[in-house]
Design a protein with these regions (language model features):
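Short, low-complexity N-terminal intrinsically disordered segments enriched in polar/charged residues
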Residues: 26-94
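Low-complexity, intrinsically disordered terminal/linker segments enriched in charged
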Residues: 34-55, 163-210
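Cleavable N-terminal signal peptides
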Residues: 7-8, 25
Length: 210
């Protein structure tokens, strides 16, 4: 159970990320929209309010990028919910890299490539019974320079996973990370994820410390 849980916790960092892109116009200035939420508790309605609150500080290109990247985040989320590995990774660039935060097992953090992510994510999906509608992955801030967008993401992930004996267990986790997305012939692709902050892990409603 512990090995399974650690895998699940690791894959949280990857996020069930995605979105859908078009748009050829990019801001040439490097401008960051400040996050408006500290400890995030952002549902569907709050997502709209968050984006609206940021709109005044964003250029038209940044607003378009925000919408398109969020849509791709949502599409990869739906792939995860459907246990479709290809869909869950569809908008990851070939050179995608995940940088995890330091922990007791990895004092300097880990650097994980797309091929390794595919292995971890398959294990995660194989152990997944269901994903709760409470799960939400939202952009909190965005900046652009040329065809590169840097976004801060917060994910609240609620799912039911299979224990070692096949029994179901509810897991609640949250993570905040910085992502870079690059605009290509395929639209926006997720190039890197840097873990910034991990929230508490709850297993069947109780704190869990791996």
């Amino acid at each position: 159970m512990k090995e399974l849980f650690l895998t699940t916790a690791l894959l949280l960092v990857v996020g069930i990320a995605g979105g859908m892109g078009l748009g050829d116009v990019f801001a040439q200035t490097e401008k960051t929209s400040p996050p408006t939420m500290g400890a995030r508790d952002c549902g569907g309605a709050d997502r709209g309010r968050l984006a609206q609150a940021q709109e005044a500080s964003l250029s038209p290109a940044e607003r378009m990028a925000w919408q398109e990247i969020q849509e791709r985040i949502d599409r990869m989320s739906h792939g995860e919910e459907a246990k479709d590995l290809n869909a869950a990774m569809h908008f990851m660039a070939d050179n995608y890299t995940l940088y995890t935060s330091p922990d007791k097992d990895s004092p300097n953090g880990k650097v994980i490539n797309k091929q390794q992510i595919a292995v971890y994510k398959k294990q995660n999906l194989d152990s997944l019974y269901s994903t709760s509608p409470e799960t939400q992955t939202d952009i909190e801030s965005l900046s652009m320079k040329g065809n590169i967008a840097t976004v801060t993401i917060h994910q609240h992930y609620v799912r039911v996973i299979r224990g070692g004996d096949g029994s179901p267990h509810e897991v609640r986790t949250s993570v905040r990370h910085r992502e870079t997305w690059i605009y290509t012939e395929r639209g926006w692709l997720q190039r890197s994820v840097q873990e910034l902050e991990r929230g508490p892990i709850l297993l069947d409603g109780q704190p869990y410390h791996p």
